[in-house]
Amino acid sequence: MIASAPTIRQATPADAAAWAQLRLGLWPDADDPLEELTQSLADAEGAVFLACAADGETVGFAEVRLRHDYVNGTESSPVGFLEGWYVQPQWQGSGVGRALLAAVQAWTRDAGCRELASDSRVEDVQAHAAHRACGFEETERVVYFRMPLEPSA
């Protein structure tokens, strides 16, 4: 049983290593250089929020960015975009994800946005359920295609 709810706070450059480790839980193949992640924490167009347990362990994160281009299913600009949202498995279902999302919502509102958007992989039904449980509505499903081009002679 989890003793007490974690504290939610905005990440600082000193948190980059802990954040990078948590990101591997969501994106196992992520290989973003630590220096790049550290620099991104100073970008006013985005924010990272961490959930920290009483013992100081980081147990979840949420990344949000402002998007000024069109975001599928939205009606305004800019839009806050939830780029990543992850809670360690043993903390899932304890309210940590909702608390992280509340911090993202507040940041997004303070940035002048009227909408918060997100995405997930089509097959990730657990993420779909988490989004719906927190008030997101599905807007559309998209399949991306690519075509390799041969260099011109």
Curated annotation (Swiss-Prot):
Annotated N-acetyltransferase domain residues: 6-153
A GO biological process held by the record: response to antibiotic
Protein residues bound to substrate: 27, 70, 83, 119, 140
Source species: Stenotrophomonas maltophilia (Pseudomonas maltophilia)
Keywords in alphabetical order: Acyltransferase, Antibiotic resistance, Transferase
Any one Pfam family match given in the protein's UniProt record, by short name: Acetyltransf_1
Name of the protein in question: Aminoglycoside N(6')-acetyltransferase type 1
EC number: 2.3.1.82
Enzyme type, top EC level: transferase
Recorded catalytic activity of this chain's protein: kanamycin B + acetyl-CoA = N(6')-acetylkanamycin B + CoA + H(+)
Function: Catalyzes the transfer of an acetyl group from acetyl-CoA to the 6'-amino group of aminoglycoside molecules conferring resistance to antibiotics containing the purpurosamine ring including amikacin, gentamicin, kanamycin B, tobramycin, netilmicin, and isepamicin.
A GO term for molecular function: aminoglycoside 6'-N-acetyltransferase activity
Assembly and binders: Homodimer.
Keyword Lipoprotein attached: no
